[in-house]
Amino acid sequence: MARPRKPLLSRDRIVGAASALVDAEGLDAVSTRRLAAVLGVSGPSLYNHFRNKEEILDAVADAVSAQVDLSMFEESDPRDWREALHDWALSYRAALAAHPHIVPVLARGPGRRPAGLRVADAVFGAMVGAGWPPAQATRIGALMRYFITGSALGSFAGGFVDDETAYDPADYPHLGQAHLLADHRRQVDEGAFETGLRALLDGLALQYEPYARAVGDDAATVRPVPNRP
């Protein structure tokens, strides 16, 4: 009786297995030996697709970048630059929140990762199209990445233990309710992100006023480079 055929090894299978390991156990869980065991193949066969662990993690990170919604930067979208940045930031953070262990890789920047570069291209093109000077558009892209990835690196509320005795009022008179934060982790963290995001965009809007006057009444509209096939 013939043996059942093993599924063909592919980049997508390797990335899928690596993503599952990262999500479940963190970056240190990924190794060529571990992946080969999970996939039921020999270790050297992975090198037909990736040169090393770093390339695999880059591909995992890029798969997360590909989940970020960029529709708000399309030429046909009616949202202005501020609304577009707001909605994109929420989508970006949601993708990172679903895969928190890969955030340190994404925080290094897009490098040569295609999906990551598409994100950078979309944001930069939309900001320049809306009237921001290229230098300012670059700073906005950097600022947004710092803010979003930084917020995804850890939970503020989750950093407080669920133990009332840890907060002796003699030592910490203002932390009497801190032990309750862990029970409201999502509400606190998402609320903090939204508050910070709106404050950031308010500040950018003030800086944008001279550029809006310079380019006309429709300056606030996102006018990115045309969509590529």
What is each model feature region?
Residues 117-169, 182, 204-207:
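Hydrophobic alpha-helical bundle segments that form small-molecule/ligand-binding pockets
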Residues 2-10:
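Short, Lys/Arg-enriched anionic-surface-contact patches
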Residues 63-68:
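Short, basic, alpha-helical segments at the C-terminal edge of helix-turn-helix-like DNA-binding modules
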Residues 157-229:
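C-terminal peripheral helix-coil segments that are non-catalytic and often amphipathic
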Residues 70-115, 134, 144:
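Hydrophobic alpha-helical connector segments
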Residues 13, 55, 87, 118, ...:
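Amphipathic alpha-helical interaction segments
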Residues 13, 17, 21-59:
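Helix-turn-helix
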